[in-house]
Every structure is written in C-alpha cells, then in structure tokens.
Design a protein with these regions (language model features):
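N-terminal Rossmann/SDR dinucleotide-binding element
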Residues: 1-19
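Short-chain dehydrogenase/reductase
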Residues: 61-85, 105, 114-122, 145-146, ...
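Conserved beta-loop-beta element that borders a ligand/cofactor-binding pocket
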Residues: 85-115
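Conserved loop-to-helix N-cap of the C-terminal "lid" that shapes the substrate pocket in Rossmann-like
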Residues: 100, 140, 145-153, 170, ...
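A conserved pocket-lining segment of Rossmann-fold NAD(P)-dependent short-chain dehydrogenase/reductase
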Residues: 124-147
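Mid/C-terminal beta-alpha module of Rossmann-like enzyme folds, strongest
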Residues: 155-215
Length: 216
C-alpha cells in the first residue's frame, strides 16, 4: 500500500522490474520518489496513469493529451498534471522511459458509471426509467468522455507493445466521442423508451435539487 509503506518506491525498485504500470499515483511527490528509486535499475518502461481531469477547463475540444497548458481545477487534476510535466521533463533530460495514459470516466465491471448528472448517483437513472422529469445543471453542456475499463487496460498494453513510439508521450484512453450531459440524458430516455423530460437549473439551485453535497 503506497500510503502505508514509507519505502514503497524503494521496494518496487528492489524487485528489479522491467516495466512498471503505476495506477495508484495521485501526488507529484510520489512520482518523484518513484523516478528516483528506479534510477539505475533495469527499468525499460514506466507507465503513469493520469486522467482527462488534468485538462480542467478546456478551451477547445477535442483536447490535446500532450498539451503543456492544461488548467486543472482541483488538487487531483493539479497533481496529475504536475506529474505529467515532471515525467516529460525527466524523459527529455535524462531519458527516463515514461509514457502517460489519461483515462476518461471509466465504466465496466466493478465501476459505477458516471451518470448524466456527472456523478455516481443512480437515482437519475431510476427517474429516467420511470419517465420522470430530470434537471441538469446550467444548460447541460458539460462534457463527459466515458471509457470501458477493458479499453483502458488495452491502452496500457498497446503502449508497452509499441514502446518506442510511446516513450515521452501522453495518450487519451476514451471513447471515440464525448457526450454532453444533455445528450447523455436524451440517450438514456431513448434507451428506456421514454419521452425525454429534461429541465435546467442554475448551479446553486441544481445542487439543492440533487441533494448530496459530496456529489456536487
């Protein structure tokens, strides 16, 4: 466990890995420790799991995974972006063999899919299935980009397989198209054979309507 093991990075390095796939790294300090620990080992490839959340407030779509001007909005995204930049710098300066994979909103077995409210509250699906009216925040133009967990795994596998082309690069792991909250909601009404009943509320009123501060 990375949080419980003070020497987590050192213990990984002691295994003399050829490839490290780092899925549980959420802080720049942990990235720095891992790079330092793996220096001088037989490592041939380090794959870092970032997130499209590192993009933050996008100015254009589709976003460029290799952008150096991302504007993350919270600590999670900020730390992912800082780790991306750190790994890119280590690759350029020292040849550290890093690749960055940026998954979207992951779905599939073991995952509760992100819903048209942008959270994991299944209540919205129940409302839609009953043909009830739902409300979306603002104008429902916020964007989600889903991906199946299996496809995320394939991105890591393909990056390992095509190592030379992947080194020093960032890649999105997302579906072919993104969805607005509004478009997603309409698709769900159609899936349940119900007439779309979609309204809109400003952010504060929508938060009251949704009712769970932790999810908003």
């Amino acid at each position: 466990d990375r949080d419980k093991e003070v020497d987590f990075a050192v213990k990984i390095a002691e295994l003399e890995p050829d490839i490290v796939v780092d899925l549980i790294n959420f802080h720049l300090s942990d990235t720095e420790k891992m790079v330092a620990a793996l220096k001088g080992t037989k490592l041939s490839h380090y794959l870092f799991c970032s997130s499209i959340w590192a993009h933050g407030r996008a100015e254009s779509l589709s976003a460029n995974p290799n952008s150096i001007t991302k504007k993350p909005l919270d600590d999670y995204g900020i730390n992912k972006f800082k780790s991306e930049m750190y790994l890119k710098a280590r690759y350029r300066e020292n040849g550290f063999p890093a690749t960055i994979i940026m998954p979207g909103q992951i779905s599939g077995p073991g995952w509760i899919i992100i819903n048209p409210w942008g959270n994991t509250n299944v209540k919205v699906f129940e409302k839609i299935a009953r043909g009830e009216k739902i409300f979306l925040p603002n104008l429902g133009m916020e964007t989600l980009h889903h991906v199946h967990g299996y496809d995320v795994a394939q991105m890591f596998f393909k990056a390992i397989t095509h190592r030379e082309a992947a080194l020093g690069e960032s890649f999105h792991a997302v579906a072919e198209e993104s969805l607005t909250l509004y478009g997603y909601a309409r698709i769900m009404y159609e899936f349940f054979n119900k007439e779309p009943q979609i309204g809109f509320l400003d952010w504060d009123k929508w938060c009251e309507y949704e009712g769970n501060k932790e999810e908003t």
